[in-house]
Amino acid sequence: MLFGVGLGGFFDGIVLHQILQWHHMLSSWYPINSMENLELNTFWDGVFHSATYIFVLSALFILWRSARLSHFKWSTREFAGTMLIGFGMFNLVEGVVDHQVLGLHHVNETVERSSWMFWDIGFLIWGAAMVALGWVAGRRS
């Protein structure tokens, strides 16, 4: 699951923060309307990316250690399933904590403010669907 959490964070940070530029880490608190706010948000985007990198490195370390055990069983379905669960869990936790509880940012801040909630709900549905799909894939292995 750690791989999925890390990859979910990378997807969010790279695609939503950098490529599409829909939001930044603190863009609801500090809107991107000045160079100072952009620098602050970019810094916290980097902190966020560093955290996701730690998840991926931790997953790689655990996988490496486990793979060296003689009783370790390789299963593509289980691996893909746990990655989907982790990715989906990232979306659910980030969607609830960052978007709703703390209000740090919302999924798509480039649309009218009245539409932000729809994007946030879609993000949560996407996360729940990945968890469910991952669970089904993992059970069949």
Indicate residue ranges for each PLM-predicted region:
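Alpha-helical transmembrane segments of multi-pass membrane proteins
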Residues: 5-9, 86-94
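N-terminal signal-anchor transmembrane alpha helix
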Residues: 1-16
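Interfacial helix-loop-helix junctions of multi-pass membrane proteins
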Residues: 16-26, 95-116
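Hydrophobic alpha-helical transmembrane segments of integral membrane proteins
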Residues: 1, 52, 74, 79-81, ...
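Perimembrane loop-to-helix junctions flanking transmembrane segments
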Residues: 23-40
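Membrane-interface loop-to-helix entry segments
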Residues: 38-61, 114-133
